[in-house]
Regions:
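Short, histidine-centered active-site or binding-site loop motifs used for metal coordination
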Residues: 110, 144, 177-181, 215-217, ...
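N-terminal Sec-pathway targeting helices
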Residues: 2-16
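Acidic active-site catalytic centers that drive phospho-/nucleotidyl reactions
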Residues: 98, 176, 303
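Aromatic-lined substrate-binding rim segments of carbohydrate-active enzymes
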Residues: 122-182, 189-194, 239-241, 319-330
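N-terminal carbohydrate-binding accessory modules
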Residues: 32-36, 40-48, 53-137, 373
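Extracellular glycoside hydrolase catalytic/binding regions
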Residues: 87-89, 113, 118, 172, ...
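Hydrophobic alpha-helical membrane-insertion segments, chiefly the h-region
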Residues: 17-28
Length: 376
């Protein structure tokens, strides 16, 4: 049906141009019959030829434009879910909206650590996630430790390479400062400011970019004494160059303590607060906590999985479905963990999946579930 409509448009355009061309042709023939000057006749013949050539060129251009349009068409996602329609995102009434003030739910995929599984974060795969899965969001997990930024500054180049692909594909992209073992964000605040100063300077007010400034604060730290002071300084650094972009701030206990952030939010109109869940561990009690927090702050689920919190303990699809319903009802955006072939339950791909092929035959049970969840 889609192709038939496009063919009809092409035919109609050709007919219209042909009618116009015919009128011009007969007008010139009339002039020819009334013109006894041979040179004038030659000039009019040349004019006629030019008109015919112009008609042919216009028809060719229309057909070529239609072919280009076909190549840019996305089957799995509506165009109005992409950046070209929604523009710079913002927060209104504790929920995410687009530049027109319309509610928007971002749904997509997070990489695993790009120092290990970065090969899957390539243009062919990300385009497939957009076109076949319907994803409008891609999250880049740049670990700070474990061979990440603190050990190898050049990993930022991989981050920028992936971000540029997502921008090219008209998607939103989260640049994630992925703390984990280095549990206290204050521990490496200087390095964080260094990275986000450079990154925000590079991307400025590019509407695709979302900053996530501390993945999962954990251990013996608090919102008041560790996370909020860190966030305020890093946010100030980003705002020097990126005035309006959404910034996601992690919360305590591996991003479960959204209630603490709700009691003492950051003074920035476009900050969101991260909630992470794994379906086998985090159940109704965490949804209840999130519901209360939503009365005060906007929440972004920047990481979740169908397994338990280890990433490799079972598949809990019933509980995962409850979370999908909860996030849809509350317009909570999300990114699933993870785009990798790691031998664990939360990985979207089976072990030894080729780096350019995420077709259904290579999807894990988690991958199949998440693909359908994005489409819903």
């Amino acid at each position: 049906m889609k192709m038939n409509k496009k063919i009809i448009k092409i035919i109609l355009a050709i007919i219209i141009i042909a009618i116009i061309g015919s009128l011009l042709y007969f007008n010139n023939m009339f002039k020819l019959l009334n013109d006894e000057n041979n040179s004038g006749i030659q000039e009019n013949i040349q004019t006629e030829n030019n008109i015919n050539n112009s008609i042919e060129n216009n028809v060719t251009n229309i057909v070529n434009d239609q072919v280009t349009s076909d190549n840019n068409t996305t089957d799995g996602i509506e165009k109005n879910n992409l950046v070209s329609y929604n523009g710079m995102l913002k927060i209104e009434n504790n929920t995410l909206v687009n530049s027109k003030g319309e509610k928007i739910q971002l749904k997509g995929i997070s990489t695993h650590g790009i120092q290990w599984y970065g090969k899957y974060a390539n243009e062919k795969v990300i385009k497939n996630l957009r076109d076949e899965w319907g994803a409008n969001l891609f999250r880049i997990a740049m670990y700070t430790s474990e061979g990440g930024y603190l050990q190898d500054r050049t990993i930022k180049n991989k981050v920028y390479e992936i971000a540029d692909i997502a921008i090219k594909l008209d998607m939103y992209v989260i640049i994630d400062w992925h703390i984990l073992d280095d549990n206290d964000p204050l521990q490496h605040i200087n390095e964080a400011q260094e990275f986000f100063e450079e990154t925000s300077l590079k991307y400025g007010n590019t509407p695709n970019i979302i900053y996530e400034i501390c993945n999962e604060p954990n251990g013996d730290i608090t919102w008041k004494n560790n996370i909020k002071p860190y966030a305020e300084k890093v946010i100030s650094t980003i705002r020097e160059n990126s005035k309006e972009n959404i910034i996601i701030v992690g919360t305590g206990t591996w991003c479960q303590d959204v209630d603490k952030a709700a009691e003492d939010p950051i003074n920035d109109k476009n900050v969101m607060y991260s909630l992470h869940f794994y379906a086998g561990t985090h159940t109704e009690w965490l949804r209840e906590r999130a519901s209360k927090a939503l009365k005060t702050i906007p929440i972004f689920v920047s990481e979740w999985g169908v397994s338990d919190a280890t990433g490799n303990g079972g598949i809990y699809l019933d509980e995962a479905n409850k979370w999908m319903k909860f996030m849809k009802q509350n317009n909570i955006s999300w990114a699933n963990w993870s785009l990798s072939d790691k031998n664990e339950a939360s990985a979207l791909l089976l072990p030894n999946t080729p780096e350019n092929d995420i077709s259904d035959k290579y999807l894990s049970e988690s991958g199949k579930f998440v693909k359908e969840a994005i489409k819903d």
